């Protein structure tokens, strides 16, 4: 079976992408990588272009373009470049891993395919513990429509392994129709639509962060620094994130039992596939951000940290943040 890794990037996200590819190869992963242009100025880094097959939207079929335009008709809260990840479903690969650029590989991703038998999608995140607040304006409606537990199958669309089948495209088009019929329920971005498609099509999902595997959370915000992450991987302490604790408290005693087994992992090595720096306005000021500079020389890395600090001191970061908030408000 043909398989590989799909990325989407442009010149603006180039340094993230460069670091991601560095971490993928450093882990020992030799899977082929295809990079789709996000739009705007394309990447020009030799370090990237030497490792990838570079593709543009025009390299895909007309059916693929029609599909993207259909998604765009309801997914109005994100740039169209975010939707180009879905072009991977129209490639000649049978299986693929899609990854956002603000991710660092912490293991050889070829190992993820060992878990794919019998599943449509394999992923490793704790999105399910947020109880739908980032995917839906009315999350309670999801369980009313699709049944109890439907929010607990949430996926972070930024990193997932997919075993393709034609039904997936049909289900995602059906999810577009569902968005049109229920405009007040979902947030208008790709992650919520993907989740609705999995519910409509009853996709077989495997979340490695759930029992029986209990992998560590892949969100960088759950770790203060590199030491805390390393100790968590070594099983030095029980890792229950803030969102997990909140979600766990809402469960019945019976439903808590599989998750209480997490305590048995203490002093045993625990797996983690990657770190995802999603939901971050900038990278650099926090200790755990160090991984995002792994591909850079010591001098370049320190200069980037210096620029971040200067931007904070001169209130440049604050001003940029306020401008973004105003733009989001005006575009609503």
Question: Each predicted region: which residue ranges?
Answer:
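A glycosyltransferase accessory/donor-loop signature
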Residues: 1, 169-332
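N-proximal low-complexity "stem/linker" segments adjacent to membrane-targeting elements
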Residues: 1-21
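Short, charged/polar "capping" segments at the starts of alpha-helices
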Residues: 15, 40-46
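Short, acidic, metal-binding catalytic loop of nucleotide-sugar glycosyltransferases
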Residues: 23-31
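Short internal beta-strands
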Residues: 33-39, 123-125
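Active-site-proximal specificity loops/subdomain of glycosyltransferases
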Residues: 44-91
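GT-A fold catalytic core of metal-dependent nucleotide-sugar glycosyltransferases
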Residues: 83-133
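Conserved catalytic core of nucleotide-sugar-dependent glycosyltransferases
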Residues: 114-178
């Amino acid at each position: 079976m043909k398989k590989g890794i799909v990325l989407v990037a442009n010149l603006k996200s180039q340094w993230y992408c460069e670091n991601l590819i560095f971490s993928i190869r450093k882990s020992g992963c030799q899977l082929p990588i295809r990079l789709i242009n996000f739009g705007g100025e394309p990447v020009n880094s030799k370090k990237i272009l030497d490792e990838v097959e570079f593709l543009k939207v025009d390299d895909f079929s007309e059916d693929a373009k029609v599909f993207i335009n259909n998604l765009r008709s309801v997914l109005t809260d994100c740039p169209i470049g975010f939707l180009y990840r879905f072009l991977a479903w129209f490639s000649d690969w049978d299986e693929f891993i899609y990854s956002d650029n603000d991710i660092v590989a912490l293991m050889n991703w070829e190992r993820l395919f060992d878990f794919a038998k019998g599943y449509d999608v394999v992923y490793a995140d704790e999105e399910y513990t947020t109880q739908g607040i980032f995917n839906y304006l009315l999350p309670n409606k999801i369980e009313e429509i699709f049944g109890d537990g439907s929010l607990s199958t949430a996926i972070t669309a930024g990193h997932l392994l997919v075993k393709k089948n034609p039904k997936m495209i049909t289900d995602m088009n059906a999810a577009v129709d569902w968005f049109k019929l229920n405009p007040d329920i979902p947030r208008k971005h790709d992650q919520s639509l993907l989740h609705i498609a999995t519910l409509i099509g009853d996709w077989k999902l495997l979340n490695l962060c759930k029992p029986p595997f209990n992998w560590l959370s892949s969100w960088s915000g759950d770790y203060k620094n590199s030491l805390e992450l390393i100790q968590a991987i070594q099983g030095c302490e029980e890792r229950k994130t803030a969102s997990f604790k909140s979600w766990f408290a809402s469960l019945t005693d019976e439903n808590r039992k599989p998750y209480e087994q997490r305590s048995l992992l203490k002093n045993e090595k625990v797996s983690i596939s990657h770190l995802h720096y999603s939901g971050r306005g900038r990278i650099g000021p926090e200790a755990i951000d160090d991984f995002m500079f792994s591909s850079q020389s010591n001098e370049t890395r320190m200069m980037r940290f210096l620029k971040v600090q200067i931007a904070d001191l001169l209130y440049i970061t604050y001003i940029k943040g306020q401008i973004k908030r105003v733009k989001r408000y005006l575009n609503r």
